[in-house]
Amino acid sequence: MKLIQLSSSDIRFKPINFEDGLNIVVGQKILKNDKKKTSNGIGKSLSLICIDYLLGKGTQSKEIKKLKALLEKEQIILSLIFEHNGVTYNIKKSHNKAWLDDVLYEKDSDYIKFLNTLVRGYSFRNIFSRFFRTDKSSYNEAIKQVS
């Protein structure tokens, strides 16, 4: 799977275009002499949480609950364009709806079924969560898996 672009209907969220190979999300501190200006709050973690949500993470995590509340309040739609096995897909999600290539999925379970077709014989979320971690508990779980 190759991520191509993460975007939002909210103009405050600048689209993120992914390049071939490894992509690293970092914050840039512009004023080096101002100790109060940090890279906190510029959207690094939010970008990862958005990708996780778009790729089927359930609402049990507090990060996803916060994100869904924001999407509902601001009427925002997130979009992720990705490629898998030579096919390009465009996923869009609001707080309660999902579209895949402009086809509406009323239920999350139907949407998850599609994601599972990408990795036949496995659960997409099970595989994805091994490599993609957005909260502290998931880091702790990774340590448990290797120890």
PLM segments and residue spans:
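Glycine-rich phosphate-binding loops of NTPases
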Residues: 95-147
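Hydrophobic or amphipathic alpha-helical targeting/insertion segments
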Residues: 84-96
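Extreme N-terminal "head/tail" segments of very large remodeling/mechanoenzyme assemblies
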Residues: 1-87
